[in-house]
Curated annotation (Swiss-Prot):
Biased composition (Acidic residues): 182-404, 492-508, 516-591
Biological role stated in the UniProt entry: Probable ATPase of unknown function. Its presence in a non-photosynthetic plant (Epifagus virginiana) and experiments in tobacco indicate that it has an essential function which is probably not related to photosynthesis.
Compositional bias annotation for Basic and acidic residues: 405-417
Subcellular location: Plastid, Chloroplast stroma
GO cellular component term of the entry, any: chloroplast stroma
Annotated region described as Disordered, given as residue ranges: 176-424, 492-592
Name of the featured protein: Protein Ycf2
Keyword Transit peptide set for record: no
Organism expressing this protein natively: Oenothera picensis (Evening primrose)
PANTHER family attached to this UniProt entry: PROTEIN YCF2, PROTEIN YCF2-RELATED
Length: 721
């Protein structure tokens, strides 16, 4: 069928055919291109090309299957490339002179390490036989670099391999629809899969080798940086040692210079003393030398004179005797004078020696003074060191105190130590009703004594006190009460004695006040429903009696309609003001605490059961209804609501029954709502603030999950493997 086509093996025709097949598959929303799509694309392109030119038919129809698979791989894996690298290895005619550079570029792309894994994946997915031929070892007779990698020379082998893969994909599509492939096809696909796995293992080994080399290079760089860091640390230590050395040298230099200066002064004074001693010794030696020389000279002169005297004795005995006597006197005079002069000189030198000794003693005293000064400087240095140690101790002490202070200051932020800020405990509406009942009873007893006084009850004052102090009491902060229900056992001792004074209907209907609900077994719920039905029947009978009495009263009444309209308008205005105040208080409380749940605490004498599981809720709608009823009772607008006589009690049994009817309706609504929520089996929030908190937590958790997914995705993209 495919041999009758007129498409040639040129690249433009094949690209046009593949694009046509892809466009058809996209318009038909097909994930796999089958043979019918290829036939339809071939038919359309044939009639488009027949008008332009006539080409020879294709020899191998399997090439079309390969081209379709190549186009699919190109659009999925290589969207940024202009031409698929596999098309380079299809035909020999692509390796022409005009396309040699492009062919070489794609050849380098296929044989490079960077794109090798992508190319192998593409080849193993779309054409396993091409990968086997491309990676085959080169033959001995091949000389060209391009053919040394075992490029495909025969088109038939290529086409058969590609057609097998395309047929395998088509059979896989049929298997997904319902048909199963044959055993031979399964064996062929298994062999191809084994070949591709071996190729993938080879590529993984190459990739591991490159990764090991890169890791080793990075480790060497890290070691080099660590050595540089160590070198810088050694330089820092050297600079610190130099700084310490300079500080020590400065301190020691100042001390040594002062001590050495004083020692040099002492040595100089000692040298001066030694010089003076040497001078004294020299003067003594001179004195001794002069004495010896003079004595010897005088002796020689005496001897010469004696010889002369002896020589002349004979000749001039008489004349010489006189001369000798004269000379002897002269000699004695000269000797005495010289001896006295030398003695005076010796005494002068001795005085000089004594002066030098005194100077030496003065210098020694100066040396001792300098030594004392040195000791004083040393003591000052020790004192400065002690001061430095003291300052260091003070700094350490201040740091410890600051650390302790910060620890103490930070203790207030500890969650375990933060006390709960509990607001005042609110009052129970049942207590309010009980107080009103007692007050009315007391007032009725007072009215018996004073029949003329009609203003004893003071309903306006009671109304103000009721709504200012009791009804709108502040709500308590309990953030986790909506998760768990309370269980409590009430002993009989705690039940007040005034219980018998209340009406029987009040005790029976207090079960339904303010959303009180018993979450026990199914039998308890049925009992509550039966009691509610019985009470409904009693209330219907009483309502009929009330209607009859009201009809009688209406006949007697003849009041103008204007007064009723004015009273009605005033009542509506009061109700609107009360509702606005109530909404403002609720908004303020909800804005102050994000998860506030208004809770009215349970009264002690509501139930006496051992297992009393309940949950108390407050709803503004029911509160407004009760307030309206109380307003109507305390401030009547018609005579039928007011007492007929001063002694008549305002809080009658029928009015109580009318009031409790609203509470019974609320109890029925709560029971049905709770049963529905239990049947659904999931927690449902009871206040808008809780539902807002639940939704905010849900969106925050989803946002965190999305952030984690994006972080992991970018981490995988930045650091693959």
């Amino acid at each position: 069928e495919f041999e009758s086509t007129i498409l040639g093996p040129s690249v433009p025709d094949l690209v046009a055919l593949t694009n046509e097949a892809l466009s058809i598959s996209i318009t038909q929303k097909k994930s796999i291109i089958d043979t019918t799509t290829i036939r339809y694309a071939l038919h359309r392109k044939t009639w488009d090309l027949e008008a332009d030119r006539n080409l020879s038919p294709a020899k191998e129809h399997g090439t079309l299957f390969y081209q379709v698979g190549r186009a699919f791989a190109h659009t999925v894996l290589l969207r940024n490339c202009s031409i698929d690298p596999i098309s380079i290895y299809i035909k020999k005619n692509l390796c022409e002179a005009g396309d040699s550079s492009l062919y070489k570029w794609y050849f380098e792309l296929g044989t490079s390490m960077k794109k090798l894994t992508i190319l192998l994946y593409l080849l193993t997915c779309s054409a396993g036989s091409i990968a086997q031929d491309l990676l085959s070892p080169p033959g001995p007779d091949e000389q060209n670099l391009i053919t040394s990698y075992g490029l495909v020379e025969n088109d038939s082998d290529l086409v058969h391999g590609l057609s097998d893969i395309v047929h395998g994909l088509l059979e896989l599509e049929g298997a997904l629809v319902g048909s199963s492939p044959t055993e031979e096809e399964v064996e062929g696909t298994e062999e191809e899969v084994e070949g591709t796995e071996e190729e993938v293992e080879g590529t993984e080994e190459e990739v591991e080798g490159t990764e090991d080399e890169e890791v080793e290079g990075t480790e060497e760089e890290v070691e080099g940086t660590e050595e540089e860091v160590e070198g810088t640390e050694e330089e820092v230590e050297g600079t610190e040692e130099e700084v310490e050395g300079t500080e020590d040298e400065e301190v020691e230099g100042t001390e040594d210079e002062e001590v050495e200066g004083t020692e040099e002064e002492v040595e100089g004074t000692e040298e001066e003393v030694e010089g003076t001693e040497e001078e004294v010794e020299g003067t003594e030696e001179e004195v001794e030398g002069t004495e010896d020389e003079e004595v010897e000279g005088t002796e020689e002169e005496v001897e010469g004179t004696e010889e002369e005297v002896e020589g002349t004795e004979d000749e001039e005995v008489e004349g010489t005797e006189e001369e000798v006597e004269g000379t002897e006197e002269e000699v004695e005079g000269t000797e005495d004078e010289e001896v006295e002069g030398t003695e005076e000189e010796v005494e002068g030198t001795e005085e000089e020696v004594e002066g030098t000794e005194e100077e030496v003693e003065g210098t020694e005293e100066e040396v001792e003074g300098t030594e004392e000064e040195v000791e004083g400087t040393e003591e000052e240095v020790e004192g400065t060191e002690e001061e430095v140690e003291g300052t260091e101790e003070e700094v350490e002490g201040t740091e410890d105190e600051e650390v302790e202070g910060t620890e103490k200051d930070s203790s207030q932020f500890d969650n375990d130590r933060v006390t709960l800020l509990l607001r005042p405990k609110p009052r129970n509406p049942l207590d309010i009703q009980r107080l009103i009942y007692q007050h009315q009873k007391y007032e009725s007893e007072l009215e018996e004594d004073d029949d003329d006084d009609e203003d004893v009850f003071a309903p306006q004052k009671m109304l103000e006190d009721l709504f200012s102090e009791l009804v709108w009491s502040p709500r308590i902060w309990h953030p986790w009460d909506f998760l768990l229900d309370c269980e409590a056992e009430i002993p009989a001792e705690e039940i007040p004695e005034e219980e018998d004074e209340l009406p029987e209907d009040a005790l029976e209907t207090e079960v339904a006040v303010w959303g009180v609900e018993e979450e026990g077994e199914a039998d308890d719920e049925e009992d509550v429903l039966l009691e509610a039905q019985q009470e409904d029947e009693l209330l219907e009978e009483e309502d009929e009696e009330l209607d009859e009495e009201e009809d009688e009263l209406d006949e007697e009444e003849e009041e103008p309609k204007e007064e009723e309209d004015e009273l009605h308008e005033e009542e509506e205005e009061e109700e609107e003001e009360e509702e606005e105040e109530e909404e403002d208080e609720l908004q303020e409380n909800d804005s102050e605490f994000f998860r506030v749940k208004p809770i009215i605490p349970r009264h002690r004498w509501i139930f006496r059961k051992k297992k009393d599981v309940f949950e108390v809720l407050s709803y503004p709608e029911e509160a407004t209804e009760i307030s309206k009823e109380l307003l109507r009772l305390l401030n009547p607008k018609t005579k039928r609501d007011a007492p007929k006589r001063p002694r008549q009690r305002w809080w009658t049994k029928k009015k109580q029954d009318k009031h409790y009817e609203l509470l019974l309706d609320r109890q029925r609504w709560l029971i049905t709502k709770r049963s529905l929520s239990k049947s659904n089996g999931f927690f449902r929030s009871n206040t808008p603030s809780e539902s807002y908190q639940y939704l905010s937590n849900l969106f925050l958790s989803n946002r965190r999950l999305l952030d984690q997914m994006t972080k992991t995705f970018f981490r995988k993209m930045a650091f693959p493997g």
